[in-house]
Amino acid sequence: MPASLPRLALIHTGGTIASRPSPDGRGLTPQTPPALPGLEGVQVSEHQPFNLPSPHVTPAHMQQLAHLIEQLAGGHDAVVVTHGTDTLEETAFFLHLCLPAGLPVVLTGSMRHAEEVSWDGPGNLLDAAQVALCPQTAGRGPLVVFGGDIFDARTVTKVHTSAVDAFGGYPGPIGRIDRTAAGPQVHYFARPEPRPTFRPVTLERRVEILYAYAGWQGEGYAGALERADGLVIAALGTGNLPPELLPLIAATDKPVVLATRTHAGPILPVYGYAGGGATLVEAGAIPASFLNAHKARLLLLVLLNLGASREDIRRVFTQGVF
C-alpha cells in the first residue's frame, strides 16, 4: 500500500466482540479477534497483547496497553482498541489519565457475540475506526464509541447489562457518527480540553472500594484500610455516610475518597450533620468531583503510585483537572 494512506493500529484485547460459544458448551469465551469491515484506503496493523474477558483485566493490563499504544504512536495516525464491555470504561479512563491527548485512541466492543444475528461488533468496530481517523478527534484523548455515540472516557459508563445500547453517562455523548450516502459523518458537541498526563512507572499501591448503604456501621472498613494504601467509598447522595463512619475517617492518615453510588452528579459536601459531606471533608475525606467510584479508584491508584501526598491528591480531585 502507498505510504501516504492513513495508518490505523487495531488492538484486540478480548471480550464479547471476540467471543463465541465454547466447544464444550460451557458458555461464551474470547476466541477469534473480529475483522474490521468496509474500511478502504487505510493501512491497518493488528496487535493482540492479551485475550481476556474484561472481568479478568487488571490495572497492570491497562498499563501494558498504554505502553503498547505509546510504542505504536510514532508509526500510526490513530488507534482502535476492542475490549470487553464490563470494564471497558475503566480501561478507557486509565488510558485517558496516562496517555497524551494527541494520538486519537478509541475503544469499542459489542454486547452480542459473533454467532448472533444481532451481532453489533462489526458496526461498532467500523464506527470506532472512522471516528479515530476523523481529524476532529485529535487532541481529545481516549474515547469510547458504541452504537454510533461518542463518549468522553471520564463520564462514560455501562448503564445496562444486556441491551445493545449499553453505554451512557451524564451529561451524555460528546459526539455522534452516522453513515450517509456521502460517507460517515462525525459530529462533536464539545471542544477538546487541556488536561495533565499522569505517568506512573509501577502500580504497586493498592486501592479498595467500599459501598455505603442504609444502616452501614463501617463493616469491612478496618480490613480494607489495613490492606490498602487508600480507599474509595461509594457514598450516599452528594457524599454522605452514616454517622458511625465519621470517627473512622477522622482517625486515618490514608486518603479516603468519597464518590457517589448515585448514577450521576458531583460530590457536594453541603450537609453538616454527623456523617454529612461537610463533616466528612472536615474529618479528612476527599470529594471525588464527578467521578464514579471505580474511576475515582483508578485516579487515586495512579496518584499514589506517583508518590502524591494526601493534599496533592485532594488538589487534583477538587480541581477536577484530569
Curated annotation (Swiss-Prot):
Picking any one GO biological process from the record gives: asparagine metabolic process
What's the Enzyme Commission number for this chain? Answer: 3.5.1.1
Identify the SUPFAM superfamilies for this entry: Glutaminase/Asparaginase
Q: What is its main location?
A: cytoplasm
- A UniProt-annotated Pfam family: Asparaginase
What GO molecular function terms would the record report?
asparaginase activity
One GO CC annotation: cytoplasm
Segments traversing the membrane: none
Region (Disordered): which ranges?
Answer: 13-37
Q: Which domain of life is it from?
A: Bacteria
Q: Which PANTHER family match?
A: 60 KDA LYSOPHOSPHOLIPASE, L-ASPARAGINASE
Entry similarity comment? Belongs to the asparaginase 1 family.
* Name of this chain's protein: Probable L-asparaginase
Organism per entry: Deinococcus radiodurans (strain ATCC 13939 / DSM 20539 / JCM 16871 / CCUG 27074 / LMG 4051 / NBRC 15346 / NCIMB 9279 / VKM B-1422 / R1)
Gene for this protein? ansA
